[in-house]
Regions:
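Active-site-proximal alpha/beta segments of enzymes that process anionic O-linked groups
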Residues: 1-9, 112, 118, 131-136
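Active-site His/acidic residue clusters
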Residues: 3-45, 49
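Loop/turn elements at helix/coil->beta-strand transitions in domains of secreted/extracellular proteins
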Residues: 9-15, 59-65, 88, 95
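Solvent-exposed loop/turn segments at secondary-structure junctions
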Residues: 21-25, 71-74, 96-98
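Soluble non-cytosolic domains of exported or imported proteins
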Residues: 34-44, 103-110, 127
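Metal-dependent active-site segment of extracytoplasmic phospho-/sulfohydrolases and closely related
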Residues: 39-83, 90, 116
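Substrate-binding rim/cap in mid-to-C-terminal beta-strand-loop elements of soluble/periplasmic
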Residues: 81-123, 134
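…; additionally, a secondary subgroup of soluble metalloenzymes is captured
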Residues: 121-129, 138
């Protein structure tokens, strides 16, 4: 709720909202469990509130939404070295994004920072190994 209120009143170019609930439910209850999916449903409602706040602030046409996670999970684990633990969802939405686009190639977490740098027109530092996911843009 506080995020939506902040969005409506603050002047901002970049907002990162971190929600840690799934990071607690996964290791405690297990990934791919009813309680984990219930928490995802709750978080989906929060995302809806944030989108509505952006609309109410009159900034929808100027906003890019990115929803992702810092890691995946297996059973009651908390990240790890398997692909299932390293790959996460990466959802990006904006009027300049191809609607319904699905990545055919592997996308890793470090590609998120590269994509954000690309969005803001920033030069990626040479030491970064990420690739900007420019194929999602129209």
């Amino acid at each position: 709720k506080w995020a939506g209120e902040y969005i409506k009143v603050a002047s901002w170019e970049w907002v990162k909202i971190v929600v840690g609930e799934t990071d607690h439910v996964g290791p405690a209850e297990g990934h791919e469990t009813p309680s984990y999916y219930e928490k995802l449903k709750e978080l989906d409602g929060y995302i809806g509130q944030i989108i509505q706040a952006v609309k109410d602030a009159g900034m929808l046409d100027e906003t890019i939404f990115i929803v992702t996670a810092d890691h995946g999970g297996i059973k009651k684990g908390h990240g790890g070295k398997t692909m299932e633990e390293m790959e996460t969802a990466f959802i990006i939405a904006d009027k300049g994004i191809k609607k319904g686009y699905e990545f055919q190639e592997s996308m890793m977490q470090f590609d998120c920072a590269s994509t954000i740098a690309y969005i803001f027109g920033l030069k990626q530092p040479q030491v970064w190994i990420g690739r900007p996911m420019i194929q999602v843009f129209k």
